[in-house]
Regions:
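Bacterial N-terminal signal peptides that target proteins for export
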Residues: 2-19
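Bacterial N-terminal signal peptides
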Residues: 17-27
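Sec/Tat signal peptide C-region and signal peptidase I cleavage site
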Residues: 28-32
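Metal-dependent amide/peptide-bond hydrolase catalytic core
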Residues: 33-37, 53, 88, 212, ...
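Acidic/His- and Gly-rich active-site-bordering loop/insert found
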Residues: 33-144, 164-170
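Alpha-helical metal-binding/catalytic segments enriched in His/Glu/Asp
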Residues: 116, 137-187, 228-232, 243-266, ...
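Short, flexible, mixed-charge acidic loops at enzyme active sites
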Residues: 125-135, 221-225, 289-294
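Acidic/histidine-rich catalytic neighborhood of metal-dependent amide-processing enzymes
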Residues: 149-225, 281-291, 442-445
Length: 447
């Protein structure tokens, strides 16, 4: 049994062979459910109360991304549960990228190498009045992060517990990566996601347990996201002289030109969105990056000297992100007279475009859902999804399947809820899907 102590991660084993190809499924019951699978379903039903208790416990821990003690406390609650299943847990310190850190749990065997991805943090600050788990009705619970994604954490853990209870983890080859800064990535991002990338290089497939606010569905493509900051400068002067050769156009017109040019250039491009979320402009401005707030002052008869705008950029692939960032930078550098501008990005968005291995994972997941009587699984349009850490892992694995966590409504708001019935269904589906995936033949490259 491992101890939850803080240390740096040892390097993951990296496959030296080529792309791993999903092979034919081993023979199983034509009836749809094997005796082992029926035992998994019964175990999940018998332990629904424990699932709700754990969900309440971790929801009542404030794990806002910038609350390192809270993020770490959620990890401390979860780690012993993984230890009890024969996983080796380790805490990866995040001080180098200005965040709390990540919890990884690993169990090595001979089966396909699976990477299960979730996150520990939420968007709700410590002083947010929405701070307590509560029952809304027999099937609905509310609380900060109950849907995104503490319900998903319970699904991951209980699916593995169900498999362990039937002694079905003996050949498991699984890494669970629970990220501590998914909602607001640390910097530099390359360091913040280094261990996840190394885990993805080791893995054959990646499964993302963030959920959705919709019916039973999953995704084989989702967009990556990054943040940007636009800063413009102008020459302060009396407004009667705006546009002349000495004063020029001012910082606000320069910012407006750039943002509107972005809209004109990119609004119609497939799988691409960019959104300014904060804009401050005037004679003097002050911005607090931690609270995402600021102040601005100016007079109607004075040409604005300063503007800062922040927002996000979402693309379906790294290649699309690189191209768009290059063009946005060109636009920002084509200044109006008397102005200057800088445009900074937090990194290149790591999108998750569809690939054949992901399509095969979806087919197996959909087949499993129908075999269990849960009906077909909808394939989600990536435009309906935000960024997630599985997009960082996806380029390195043969197949990736996302959005297989819990369901609810009002996520990232004081109305956030989770559907307990859907958590049970998704747990049964996850446990059975992982079992079937463990028994899938793979064409392995040499290590």
């Amino acid at each position: 049994m491992s101890v939850f102590t803080e240390h740096r991660a040892a390097p993951f084993r990296r496959a030296a062979g080529g792309v791993l190809l999903l092979g034919l499924l081993l023979a199983r019951s034509v009836a749809g459910q094997s005796a082992e699978e029926l035992q998994l379903l019964a175990w999940v039903d018998d332990h629904r109360g424990e699932a709700v208790d754990l969900l309440e416990q971790i929801t009542n821990i404030n794990s806002y991304t910038l609350n390192p003690d809270g993020v770490r406390e959620v990890a401390r609650v979860l780690a012993p549960h993984f230890d009890a299943l024969g996983f080796e847990t380790r805490w990866i310190d995040g001080s180098a990228f200005e965040r709390s850190g990540h919890l990884f749990a690993e169990r090595r065997g001979t089966g396909p190498r699976m990477l299960l991805i979730g996150h520990l943090d939420t968007v709700f600050p410590e002083d947010d009045p929405f701070d307590t788990f509560r029952l809304v009705d027999d099937t609905t619970v509310a609380g900060p992060g109950v849907g995104d994604m503490k319900g998903g954490l319970v699904i991951i853990l209980q699916a593995l517990q169900a498999l362990h209870a039937q002694q079905l983890l003996d050949d498991a080859n699984i890494t669970v990566a629970l990220i501590g800064d998914e909602e607001r990535s640390g910097s530099p991002r390359e360091l913040a996601r280094r261990d996840l990338v190394e885990a993805a290089r080791w893995a054959d497939v990646a499964l993302g347990f963030e959920g959705l606010e919709t019916a039973t569905s999953a995704a084989i493509a989702r967009r990556g996201a990054t943040g940007w900051t636009l800063t413009t400068r102008g020459i302060r002067g009396h407004s009667s002289r705006i546009f002349d050769d000495e004063i020029g156009y001012g910082a606000i017109f320069e910012a407006a030109r750039i943002l509107n040019s972005f809209r004109e250039e990119f609004a119609a491009e497939a799988f691409l969105t960019f959104s300014p979320g904060l804009l401050l402009g005037g004679s003097e401005i002050s911005r607090d990056e931690i609270s995402s707030s600021g102040t601005a002052s100016g007079l109607s008869n004075v040409v604005a000297e300063s503007v800062v705008a922040t927002g996000d950029l979402r693309t379906i692939s790294r290649e699309q992100g690189q191209r768009v960032i290059a063009r946005m930078t060109e636009i920002a550098e084509d200044h109006l007279p008397g102005t200057s501008a800088t445009l900074e990005f937090r990194g290149i968005p790591e999108g998750m475009p569809p690939k054949p291995g992901s399509e095969r994972l979806f087919e197996l997941y959909d087949e499993t859902s129908q075999d269990l009587g849960f009906g077909p699984v909808d394939l989600i349009d990536p435009m309906r999804l935000g960024g997630a850490d599985i997009s960082t892992a996806a380029p390195y694995v043969d197949g990736a399947l996302a959005a297989i966590g819990g369901m609810g409504a009002g996520w990232h708001s004081p109305d956030e809820t989770a559907d307990l019935k859907k958590i049970t269904i998704r747990t049964k589906l996850a446990a059975t899907f992982i079992l079937r995936l463990m028994r899938t033949q793979w064409s392995q490259g040499s290590d």
